[in-house]
Amino acid sequence: MDKRRFLEALGEAFLPIRPAGQIVLANTLAKELFQEERLEGRKVGALVCNQELLGHVQEAFDTDGPVTKEFTLSAANSPGGVQNGITAWHLDSAITDTPIKEKRILLRNVTQNYLTNQMRRDFVANASHELRTPLTIIVGYLENLMEDNLMEESPGLARKFIGVMHQNSQRLMNIIEDMLMISKLESGHKAILKEQWFHLTSCVDDVFSRLDSIREKKQAALHMNIPPDWELYGDPFYWTQVLFNLVENALKQNTEPGLSVTVAAARTPEACVITVTDTGVGIPAESLPFLFNRFYRVETHHSSEIKGTGLGLSIVKRAVEAHDGAITVSSTPHRETVFTITIPLKRFREEKEA
């Protein structure tokens, strides 16, 4: 295998660079990374505006022996044209044995891995916080029951304490169940689905029945606009969970009476489209990009009163994606919020032909 074919087979952006900063050659992935057709003979400093990245490259040149390091950059002027956020990079370098000493540099964009690891760290931190709160309450009330002998001296107060502990133990169970559900969806995706043809109306009926007490308390109206024979191919358990989370979320987020929530479904030439629309207070525009993140909660004047695990919409997104679908959200403050689920019809055609 010649040098050029070897470089193309690396699977990484590869840039042998001379000490003066001149690029000796570059493979296709390096050209894609810098969005340039011709890199050979050019200087790195002429290609990269980000002084942080140039600093790391220069440090690799100035260091005797091989260098391996990972670093993050502000993304505004990073290679690849990313305009916001953070990019993460892995740099390896070594000195050649050729008469003209070159510092070979292997530069990789590892942003996706960085973000995945960051998400895991955030999840552990958030999960620990969410679990600690009800556990602390339960332990505190148990200590009072044991130390003050309340069961005998004040049975009424003791029953109240037990009720609080039961409520928080239920919250713990809900968090754990939601975490397990997300874990299943992310690890197995389609492998965990028990797919079959089913009527979507049966899922909606189940959801409305389970949420009827909240609907009545909120003085809200629940509507369904789906043909009776409308069928989906998928796991009815997860579709029921998706619709339950979306409708429950609409009911919980809106405190004023008169709310209307509508679940509708229709077919386009290319997709099945399911929408959940509510006529409530809406969602601030700045919150929309983060809405499906784990434990994210929209900040409102009554957000502290809303009970939940903070995982409901994350479960919705992953369950929809497990069915090859996509979900988006749009919101007009004080008018309506619409969650739109799109599932390609190709998925159903393939199943019917199988």
Give residue ranges: language-model regions.
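Short conserved segment of the HATPase_c
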Residues: 283-295
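Conserved catalytic submotifs in the C-terminal HATPase_c
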Residues: 196-197, 216, 221-230
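PAS-family sensory/regulatory modules and their coupling/dimerization elements
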Residues: 44-112
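Short alpha-helical segment of the dimerization/phosphotransfer core of two-component systems
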Residues: 167-172
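Conserved micro-motifs of the catalytic ATP-binding
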Residues: 187-193, 231-234
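Sensory modules in modular signal-transduction proteins
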Residues: 1-34
